[in-house]
Structure formats: structure tokens, C-alpha cells
Amino acid sequence: MSALVYFSSSSENTHRFMQRLGLPATRIPLNERERIRVDEPYILVVPSYGGGGMAGAVPRQVIRFLNDEHNRARIRGVIASGNRNFGDAWGCAGDVIAQKYGVPWLYRFELMGTQRDIDNVRRGVNEFWQQLPRSA
């Protein structure tokens, strides 16, 4: 299986989800001055910001990470978290990233996710990597 890369704010909701998921993952640092490079194809797991609108939905740290062409070239899919209180815009960072980078929006979950979300993501990530051509 290939990589998961995620960002979690100081609320740690996405981090707790990733810990429960139990799959190898790299965290995009909270400190915007810290940089990471990913050398293999990955699925990005990202929270949605901005109170339900598209503007500001993607965290700045994630934008900076994806502005690095090396990292951007390796994204293969996106999973988003959010808050259902934002109606149709919940998890909208996934939609923004999927459209901008031409990758599939694989799943969305609320806040820290449920056990059902954990099971669905584990299964979905495994199936996704099995179906993706090796050269991707």
C-alpha cells in the first residue's frame, strides 16, 4: 500500500482519526515554516475550514504543501473531514482539492469520524491502491 498524508489543526480531530485508522501516514506540520516532501504516491486526508464556504476551505499548510510541485505530482486522491453543521459545504476542502488537481474525492467524514468511517476508509484505501496502475 502507498502513503497517506494528512493535516490536522490543533483541535487534533484529523490526527485522532488517523491514529485510529492505524495505517502508515505522514503529517503535514502545523508550523508553516516546516516543510515535508513525499516521494511516493499518496492520498491526502484534509480537514475543511472556513465555516462552510469554499473560500478558505483548504488549510494554508496544505496549500503550501501542494504548491511544492514535487508533492503535488504525487497526489492520487483526497479524503476530507468537516462538520455537518455546514450543510452541503461539509468536507468541501476535498471537493476543492479534487477539482484543482484532477484526483478523485474518495471519502468524507465528520470531525473525528466514527468506527464505520474508519472501516470504510481502511477498506477504500486498500481497494484504491489495488486498482491504481503501478505506474501512477
Swiss-Prot record:
Pfam families xref list: Flavodoxin_NdrI (PF07972)
Gene Ontology terms describing biological process: protein modification process
GO function term, MF aspect, one: FMN binding
InterPro entries, per database record: Flavoprotein-like_sf, RNR_Ib_NrdI_bac, RNR_NrdI
Coiled-coil regions listed in the entry: none
UniProt family annotation: Belongs to the NrdI family.
Listed PANTHER family: PROTEIN NRDI
Purpose: Probably involved in ribonucleotide reductase function.
NCBIfam families referenced in this protein's UniProt entry, alphabetically: nrdI (TIGR00333)
Protein known as: Protein NrdI
Species lineage: Bacteria, Pseudomonadati, Pseudomonadota, Gammaproteobacteria, Enterobacterales
Gene: nrdI
